[in-house]
């Protein structure tokens, strides 16, 4: 007999009745029923009920067992009485009578119980993550992640992609976040960086003559945490292809992503129609570049109905250049109570408020109500209703100004309206490609900077770069699903003259480009092929499949919101010897 087990805790069925078996696992819980001790014994695979009566030679030992002790038992498999069968577990038709037991590991008083789904503070869960991982929901999430990664690999191999590994220690490069720097012992005063993404390396793989590359790549970014983003590191399906157009990339990755969601989505509907929406239209209609298309609400510009109207705030606002009035339809939101609640929401988001109109049945016909309706009159309110396609019982909310001043709040309001009015289908995955991203934007100081990936090919090539930088569009694209960005990619700029010009517009001289991207600049002198690709966030994919809003629920050992590993006490202070080896000195903060 094996030293620890003949079967797992999910394996025994009625076919094993009468057999002597050996099981090992953790004590999930102990119950005393009339002097007979019942133990739910748990391992990675499942649960088996084992019991010990006073006639057992190890009864006195079993009495001492507590939750989460690790034990090995030998016993006889018996069938449960018909009335005691548990159909919820594979072993629910049998139980094992203990005849021998060995304690493999005791457990101190638990800082959080493994049994049950009671919520505990996240700090406690992260400090004792090894215990938290034993809990069924988190254990299942981590196993789901493993299966998703395995399936992704197989799907990529099946379409002739080759998996390569790229360096983890490399040079710093501007990719939208802060680098994690690594001091060099052999080169005092110089630093490596952990890669924010394998961006340059995967492009160099294409220059190296390989056709289709992928890897499940770790990425390191010193970012502020969010619920859907880890503050230090994450994993992505990274891929690149030679001799491809933007549509080729879509046609390649779409079946992979759709297949993963169909395989692991638990029966939820996976949309087959993935519309292409321009970045500007997405911002206009949804207030974000990662829209949730399960929500049917589509915002519209209604400036014409307020220009010269009796609502002076909007009328005067529209006299300023670059302003507009945008409407958020709310089907079924036609009550003053709901409208007032949404107005308060806008105020909580830092805006003065949100105007509204709602339509009600007055017996003699439809009537528009609310402060705006009184100020602009029945003809304008009726024109708004017809434009938005609203009926009795519906409402519309209005925000005005320059789009940058209210667009994000409008997007959040659209989400809240959809959630509160029950408009969002929770059993659906809705995808959309967001395309035609602007190449450049102005930073907080008014300087031109890259808005996304600096290595993207501008639409129109060199000619486009000769005009207004803020009008230049790139061959950049994102895939949004249910309000999250899942995939981001681009057709790359493989022409050195266009690359130099693109960086020059963003304030990088040729010398700096060569210094920071010397490897790629040098490679592009030797016949670089047209190429493009994308990366899909593994963490976010699994987060959606697991139906959780917190990315830490699908990462085995995540950091907390302050980028701390409470279990391993990281970050920690280096020793003096370590600092001397690296020729470093810590300057205390004042």
Swiss-Prot record:
<keyword id="KW-0067">ATP-binding</keyword>
<dbReference type="Pfam" id="PF00152">
    <property type="entry name" value="tRNA-synt_2"/>
</dbReference>
<dbReference type="GO" id="GO:0006422">
    <property type="term" value="P:aspartyl-tRNA aminoacylation"/>
</dbReference>
<protein>
    <recommendedName>
        <fullName>Aspartate--tRNA(Asp/Asn) ligase</fullName>
        <ecNumber>6.1.1.23</ecNumber>
    </recommendedName>
</protein>
<dbReference type="InterPro" id="IPR004524">
    <property type="entry name" value="Asp-tRNA-ligase_1"/>
</dbReference>
<dbReference type="InterPro" id="IPR006195">
    <property type="entry name" value="aa-tRNA-synth_II"/>
</dbReference>
<feature type="binding site">
    <location>
        <position position="492"/>
    </location>
    <ligand>
        <name>L-aspartate</name>
    </ligand>
</feature>
<dbReference type="InterPro" id="IPR012340">
    <property type="entry name" value="NA-bd_OB-fold"/>
</dbReference>
<feature type="binding site">
    <location>
        <position position="175"/>
    </location>
    <ligand>
        <name>L-aspartate</name>
    </ligand>
</feature>
<dbReference type="InterPro" id="IPR002312">
    <property type="entry name" value="Asp/Asn-tRNA-synth_IIb"/>
</dbReference>
<dbReference type="GO" id="GO:0050560">
    <property type="term" value="F:aspartate-tRNA(Asn) ligase activity"/>
</dbReference>
<keyword id="KW-0963">Cytoplasm</keyword>
<dbReference type="InterPro" id="IPR029351">
    <property type="entry name" value="GAD_dom"/>
</dbReference>
<keyword id="KW-0648">Protein biosynthesis</keyword>
<feature type="region of interest" description="Aspartate">
    <location>
        <begin position="199"/>
        <end position="202"/>
    </location>
</feature>
<dbReference type="InterPro" id="IPR045864">
    <property type="entry name" value="aa-tRNA-synth_II/BPL/LPL"/>
</dbReference>
<dbReference type="Pfam" id="PF02938">
    <property type="entry name" value="GAD"/>
</dbReference>
<dbReference type="GO" id="GO:0003676">
    <property type="term" value="F:nucleic acid binding"/>
</dbReference>
<comment type="function">
    <text>Aspartyl-tRNA synthetase with relaxed tRNA specificity since it is able to aspartylate not only its cognate tRNA(Asp) but also tRNA(Asn). Reaction proceeds in two steps: L-aspartate is first activated by ATP to form Asp-AMP and then transferred to the acceptor end of tRNA(Asp/Asn).</text>
</comment>
<dbReference type="InterPro" id="IPR047089">
    <property type="entry name" value="Asp-tRNA-ligase_1_N"/>
</dbReference>
<dbReference type="InterPro" id="IPR004115">
    <property type="entry name" value="GAD-like_sf"/>
</dbReference>
<comment type="subunit">
    <text>Homodimer.</text>
</comment>
<feature type="site" description="Important for tRNA non-discrimination">
    <location>
        <position position="33"/>
    </location>
</feature>
<keyword id="KW-0547">Nucleotide-binding</keyword>
<dbReference type="GO" id="GO:0005524">
    <property type="term" value="F:ATP binding"/>
</dbReference>
<feature type="binding site">
    <location>
        <position position="221"/>
    </location>
    <ligand>
        <name>L-aspartate</name>
    </ligand>
</feature>
<keyword id="KW-0436">Ligase</keyword>
<dbReference type="Pfam" id="PF01336">
    <property type="entry name" value="tRNA_anti-codon"/>
</dbReference>
<feature type="binding site">
    <location>
        <position position="452"/>
    </location>
    <ligand>
        <name>L-aspartate</name>
    </ligand>
</feature>
<keyword id="KW-0030">Aminoacyl-tRNA synthetase</keyword>
<comment type="similarity">
    <text>Belongs to the class-II aminoacyl-tRNA synthetase family. Type 1 subfamily.</text>
</comment>
<dbReference type="GO" id="GO:0004815">
    <property type="term" value="F:aspartate-tRNA ligase activity"/>
</dbReference>
<dbReference type="GO" id="GO:0005737">
    <property type="term" value="C:cytoplasm"/>
</dbReference>
<feature type="binding site">
    <location>
        <begin position="537"/>
        <end position="540"/>
    </location>
    <ligand>
        <name>ATP</name>
    </ligand>
</feature>
<dbReference type="InterPro" id="IPR004365">
    <property type="entry name" value="NA-bd_OB_tRNA"/>
</dbReference>
<feature type="binding site">
    <location>
        <begin position="221"/>
        <end position="223"/>
    </location>
    <ligand>
        <name>ATP</name>
    </ligand>
</feature>
<dbReference type="InterPro" id="IPR004364">
    <property type="entry name" value="Aa-tRNA-synt_II"/>
</dbReference>
<feature type="binding site">
    <location>
        <position position="485"/>
    </location>
    <ligand>
        <name>ATP</name>
    </ligand>
</feature>
């Amino acid at each position: 007999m094996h030293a620890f087990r003949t079967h797992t805790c999910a394996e025994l069925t009625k076919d094993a009745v009468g057999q002597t078996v050996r099981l090992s696992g953790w004590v999930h819980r102990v119950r005393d029923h009339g002097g007979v001790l019942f133990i739910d014994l748990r391992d990675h695979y499942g649960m088996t009920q084992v019991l010990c009566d006073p006639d057992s030679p190890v009864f006195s030992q079993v009495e001492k067992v507590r939750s989460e002790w690790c034990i090995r038992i030998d016993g006889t498999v018996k069938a449960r009485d018909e009335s005691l069968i548990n159909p919820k577990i594979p072993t629910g038709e049998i139980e094992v009578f203990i005849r021998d037991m060995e304690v493999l590991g005791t457990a101190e008083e638990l800082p959080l119980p493994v049994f049950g789904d009671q919520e505990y503070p996240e700090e406690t869960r992260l400090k004792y993550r090894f215990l938290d991982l034993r809990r069924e929901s988190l254990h299942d999430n981590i196993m789901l992640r493993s299966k998703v990664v395995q399936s992704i690999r197989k799907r990529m191999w099946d379409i002739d992609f080759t998996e390569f590994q790229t360096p983890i220690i490399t040079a710093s490069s501007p990719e939208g976040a802060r680098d994690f720097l690594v001091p060099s012992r052999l080169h005092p005063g110089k630093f490596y960086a952990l890669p924010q993404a394998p961006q340059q390396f995967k492009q160099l793989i294409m220059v190296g003559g390989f056709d289709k590359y992928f890897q499940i790549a770790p990425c390191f970014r010193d970012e502020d945490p969010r619920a859907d983003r880890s503050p230090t590191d994450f994993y992505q399906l990274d891929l690149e292809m030679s001799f491809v157009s933007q549509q080729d990339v879509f046609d390649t990755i779409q079946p992979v992503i759709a297949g993963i969601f169909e395989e692991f989505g638990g029966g939820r509907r996976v949309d087959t129609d993935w519309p292409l929406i321009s970045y500007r239209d997405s911002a206009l209609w949804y207030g974000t570049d990662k829209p949730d298309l399960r929500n049917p609400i589509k915002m519209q510009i209604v400036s014409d109905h307020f220009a010269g109207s009796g609502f002076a705030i909007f009328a005067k606002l529209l006299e300023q250049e670059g302003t507009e009035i945008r409407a958020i339809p709310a089907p079924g939101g036609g009550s003053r109570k709901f409208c007032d609640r949404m107005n308060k929401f806008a105020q909580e988001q830092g805006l003065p408020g949100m105007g509204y109109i709602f339509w009600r049945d007055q017996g003699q016909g439809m009537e528009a109500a609310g402060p705006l309706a009184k100020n602009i009159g029945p003809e304008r309110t009726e024109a708004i209703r017809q434009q938005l396609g609203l009926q009795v019982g519906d409402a519309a909310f209005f925000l005005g100004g320059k789009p940058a001043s209210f667009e994000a709040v409008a997007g959040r309001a659209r989400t809240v309206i959809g959630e509160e009015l029950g408009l969002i289908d929770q059993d659906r995955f809705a995808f959309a490609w967001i395309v035609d991203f602007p190449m450049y934007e102005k930073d907080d100081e008014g300087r031109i900077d890259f808005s996304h990936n600096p290595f993207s090919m501008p639409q129109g090539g060199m000619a486009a770069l000769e005009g207004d930088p803020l009008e230049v569009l790139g061959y950049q694209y994102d895939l949004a699903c249910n309000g999250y960005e899942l995939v981001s990619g681009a057709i790359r700029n493989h022409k050195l003259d266009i690359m130099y010009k693109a960086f020059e517009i963003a304030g990088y001289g040729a010398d700096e480009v060569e210094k920071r991207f010397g490897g790629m600049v040098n490679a592009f002198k030797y016949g670089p092929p047209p190429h493009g690709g994308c990366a899909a966030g593994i963490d976010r994919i699994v987060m959606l499949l697991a139906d959780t809003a917190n990315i830490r629920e699908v990462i085995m050992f995540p950091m907390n919101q302050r980028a701390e590993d409470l279990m391993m006490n990281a970050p920690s202070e280096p020793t003096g010897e370590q600092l001397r080896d690296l020729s470093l000195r810590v300057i205390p903060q004042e």
